[in-house]
Regions:
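Conserved beta-strand-loop-alpha-helix junction that forms the acyl-donor binding cleft
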Residues: 21-22
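Vicinal oxygen chelate
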Residues: 1-17, 27-28, 34-103
Length: 103
């Protein structure tokens, strides 16, 4: 029997999942602004993003549209978020300008 890796290759012990109001728009924002690599995007029957994986540097993060019927709400819907993410990049000024201009 094959052994299953406890932490999948390319992942870390903690992998954030972002719940957003418009998954497709958010994915394009992260791709255009931060240069993330889109690893996969799976849609539900209604067209919402059910699961997406994005990679920036050596880190993977996941993203999905909000699913209120499963109590998954975006920060926009609930009026904020108790969670923050720190993103480390080589040239912060360049990335800031790119993100600012891609809004």
């Amino acid at each position: 029997m094959n052994e299953i890796e406890k932490i999948p290759k390319g992942y870390h012990s903690i992998t954030p999942v972002l719940i957003v109001k418009n998954g497709d728009e958010a994915i394009e924002f992260y791709k255009n602004g931060f240069g993330v690599e889109e690893r996969c995007r799976m849609k539900g029957p209604d067209g919402r993003v059910a699961h997406a994986e994005l990679k920036l540097g050596d880190s993977v993060f996941m993203l999905s549209d909000e699913y209120p019927e499963m109590k998954c709400h975006s920060p926009k819907t609930i009026g904020g978020s108790p969670v923050s993410m720190y993103v480390y990049v080589d040239d912060v000024d360049s990335i800031f300008n790119k993100v600012w201009n891609s809004r």
